């Protein structure tokens, strides 16, 4: 291909090919890529997310957004845990979160119209996000998140292709879990490069 990739992207592709997941994810965390975990209840995605959180530099200001407390951050002293309930939505929490000057925002699950707000946060100075979504496989994740984003007031006024391309260029890595094993790993910097330039 004629796509110029950075050395670290080649290193990640090599690590992925060799199933060297520790190297792959350490680079992904260091480069502040946005990572999405996929899988059903009990699939292992929360346990894996905790392992990724431990890889984040400990002086990072973390904001976690959850409905029930799952993500402990014992090594990150500069953190805030925010919770959404029926009367306080994830969308409202994301808006409030911006005032807390986070380095990284960890949203445990994308479920509804907050998806667009979270994508916007990742694209406006807060990269390195970790989140999860329910989808059938790794390749369908971008489409699922785009569907959720279209439920927002902003999303309703935008073309679907624009939203989908925003998702494809924002979510860098997708990990699909099935019965506590990671069965799929998506990372395609070539596709991202082409989408950013309108060539896909």
Where are these regions (language model features)?
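P-loop NTP-binding catalytic core
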Residues: 1-30
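Generic low-polarity alpha-helical segments
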Residues: 1-4, 105, 190
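Switch/coupling sub-region of P-loop NTPases
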Residues: 22, 32-41, 51-168
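Conserved lysine of the Walker
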Residues: 45
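Conserved P-loop NTPase
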Residues: 165-200
